[in-house]
Amino acid sequence: IRDRNNASSILIQSWQRFRRLINNSINDDVFVNSRSMATDLHQVHLSDEVLNINGGEMMVVDIAGITEQLQCLVFGDIIRSVYSLKHGDFDPDERTSTKPVPKRIIIFVDELNKYAPSTSSKNSPLLANLLDITERGRSEGVVLFSAEQFRSAIHERIKGNCGTNVYGRTNAIEVSRPDYKFVPTVYANMMTRLKKGDLILHHPVFKTLLKIQFPFPSYNQGGSK
């Protein structure tokens, strides 16, 4: 019920939804500071795994099974752990690996617009970390590589600091947005008709856009041909 004497009051239903969201988040098992010792569960602390990553290794974090709010928290924790590793901001006993810290760490994230949308608040800690990577990460050996369905949905400063852009097939509505004003009409029309495996590359070293073809897999992926 809204207070008639206070136009800025919040509905009780809104408070209830907010309370439910907070309770579901803070009471989730992801916040339990312990892990099972059962070897078949393979439970680890993500921050410990990031701090012990070595050159040439790949770490995959599947967050599809948790809520969107928790996905942001997990992603933010990984980003902070990577920066702690590169800056040496960790206790010596936390890194058990005897190998040197990798000179370069590449972070690949799917659907970056979920974590740094164009409508993101300026006070978002996660956005601040992502902006730090895109603006200064290259000099510190941290590279952000992302894939998303709609480039226009990403925060402006992140797009502005992107050195290489690769475009796949998209729809006419997306191509008509301001993000594609620099794209010649012939290439814009081409983006709506690209075949699977065909891409358009944009990089400052080239004077024009380039159409490239992703190599066909050299092995049998199974399924119908």
Q: Each predicted region: which residue ranges?
A:
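General structural signal for secondary-structure boundaries
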Residues: 23, 40-53, 171-173, 184-190, ...
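Conserved ATP-driven motor cores of ASCE-family P-loop NTPases powering translocation/secretion/packaging/pilus
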Residues: 125-215
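Short, acidic Gly/Pro/Ser/Thr-rich loop/turn segments
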Residues: 68, 208, 219
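Charge-patterned, long linear interaction tracts outside catalytic cores
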Residues: 211-225
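Short, solvent-exposed amphipathic alpha-helical segments in soluble enzyme
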Residues: 75-79, 182-183, 217-218
